[in-house]
């Protein structure tokens, strides 16, 4: 079998809103799939920062401490040790809060930003990209990866058509649903929505969104061959279990 570059894209654990069962599945799959030899991409929203959702609010949510969120988010980096981190819209709240409010708030948010980025680097993240539709794109061979910059039922198709290269793929998070779609575009391509690693029942805003009915626990795994071809697939929860295969094999017909 030719050398394969294996990767895992996992996103949307949301700090102290993380689902411990989903994280346990991710860690176990990573060991089965190749451990430290796998390129691990944290796809964003590893922290929730819900108290910054409306800037610096005065409601109950706005009064919540960030400490538990920071602790749980950092534990994810300690345990999974991703090579790449794509900031999500929830991490971007730190930047947004610096654009409004007091100097004290700006300094605090900058301090938190510096701290979580430094912690990610300490845990092995060589690449950290901002939440930015142009600058926040990570490319591994023919596979593009982003946190997510579209909403709604067609979000995966729209982003796939926008980011996937000729014959390649796009993987995104953000929308929390699981999806694998063949793109109708010149040269073909695929787009994947990676699901999430958080607890839907504890995220209060999900109760008012029909789209939350599509949420699913999971992530995306795949590999790239020495010749530049790729394969990617969803790893996700089925009922109360997670099911995956451990072995990967490539086959070339003798006629070639």
Short names for language-model regions:
Residues 143-233:
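Conserved beta-sheet core of the metallophosphoesterase superfamily
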Residues 1-3, 30-36, 78-80, 138-140, ...:
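Flexible, charged surface loops at secondary-structure boundaries
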């Amino acid at each position: 079998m030719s050398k394969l570059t294996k990767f895992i894209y996992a996103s949307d654990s949301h700090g102290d809103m993380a689902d411990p069962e989903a994280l346990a599945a991710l860690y176990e799959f990573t060991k089965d799939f190749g451990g430290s030899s796998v390129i691990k991409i944290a796809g964003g929203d590893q922290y929730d920062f819900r108290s910054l959702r409306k800037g610096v609010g005065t409601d109950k949510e706005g009064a919540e401490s960030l400490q538990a969120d920071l602790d749980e988010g950092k534990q994810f980096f300690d345990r999974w040790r991703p090579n790449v981190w794509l900031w999500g819209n929830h991490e971007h709240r730190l930047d947004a809060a610096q654009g409004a409010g007091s100097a004290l708030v700006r300094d605090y948010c900058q301090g938190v930003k510096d701290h979580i980025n430094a912690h990610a680097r300490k845990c092995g993240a060589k690449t950290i990209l901002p939440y930015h539709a142009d600058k926040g794109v990570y490319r591994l061979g023919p596979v593009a990866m982003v946190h997510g910059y579209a909403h709604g039922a067609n979000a995966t198709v729209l982003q796939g058509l926008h980011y996937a290269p000729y014959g390649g793929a796009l993987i995104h998070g953000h929308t929390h649903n699981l999806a694998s779609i063949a793109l109708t575009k010149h040269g073909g391509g695929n787009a994947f929505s990676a699901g999430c690693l958080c607890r839907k029942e504890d995220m209060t805003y999900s109760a008012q969104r029909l789209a939350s009915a599509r949420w699913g626990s999971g992530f995306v795994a795949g590999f790239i061959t020495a010749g530049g071809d790729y394969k990617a697939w969803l790893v996700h929860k089925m009922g109360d279990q997670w099911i995956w295969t451990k072995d990967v094999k490539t086959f070339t017909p003798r006629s070639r």
